[in-house]
């Protein structure tokens, strides 16, 4: 039996694959451009080992956009069911500060559970929004 040959993907930086079902869903299509970019950035930082640590300041720098737009993009993804807040941020000048951590609902959970796909339960009209 012949061995399957690998596809010629450039794997030097890793590969981020997003489900076609998600990309063609009305929930995804109703998102703003900043929220769509944030969704991809969150998946880029995803690991099966734990929740994604990604804050507003980091989103401001990587999208790039204003603080208000970054906060709005997080809220939009949360309301649409694409992300769920796991731990809120904490700032303390004497001890270590930590960023917000998120669970991406279309990807497996670090607790060895499958994706919950909460975004499928939310019905959004493209013309009217959430």
Residue ranges and their predicted role:
Residues 1-58, 62, 80, 97:
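Short recognition helix of helix-turn-helix/winged-helix DNA-binding domains
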Residues 4, 88, 124-126:
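Intrinsically disordered, low-complexity segments enriched in Ser/Pro/Gly/Ala and basic residues
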Residues 6, 21-22, 68, 106, ...:
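Acidic/proline-rich low-complexity IDRs
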Residues 8, 26, 48, 64, ...:
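Proline-rich intrinsically disordered, low-complexity coils
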Residues 10, 61, 87-88, 117-121:
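Acidic-enriched, low-complexity/disordered segments with a strong bias for Aspartate over Glutamate
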Residues 18-21, 40, 66, 86, ...:
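Compositionally biased, intrinsically disordered low-complexity segments
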Residues 44-103, 107-108:
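Winged helix-turn-helix DNA-binding recognition segment
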Residues 100-130:
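Short, amphipathic alpha-helical interaction segments positioned at domain boundaries
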């Amino acid at each position: 039996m012949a061995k399957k040959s690998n596809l010629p993907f450039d794997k030097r930086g890793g590969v981020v694959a997003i489900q076609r079902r998600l990309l063609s869903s009305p929930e995804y299509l109703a998102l703003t451009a900043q929220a769509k970019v944030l969704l991809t950035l969150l998946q880029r930082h995803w690991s099966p080992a734990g929740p994604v640590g990604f804050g507003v300041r980091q989103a401001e720098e990587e999208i790039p956009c204003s603080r208000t737009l970054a906060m709005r993009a997080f809220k939009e993804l949360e309301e649409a069911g694409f992300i769920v807040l796991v731990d809120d941020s904490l700032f303390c000048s004497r001890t270590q500060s930590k960023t917000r951590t998120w669970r991406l609902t279309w990807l497996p959970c670090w607790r060895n559970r499958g994706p919950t796909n909460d975004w499928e339960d939310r019905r959004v009209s493209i013309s009217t929004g959430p």
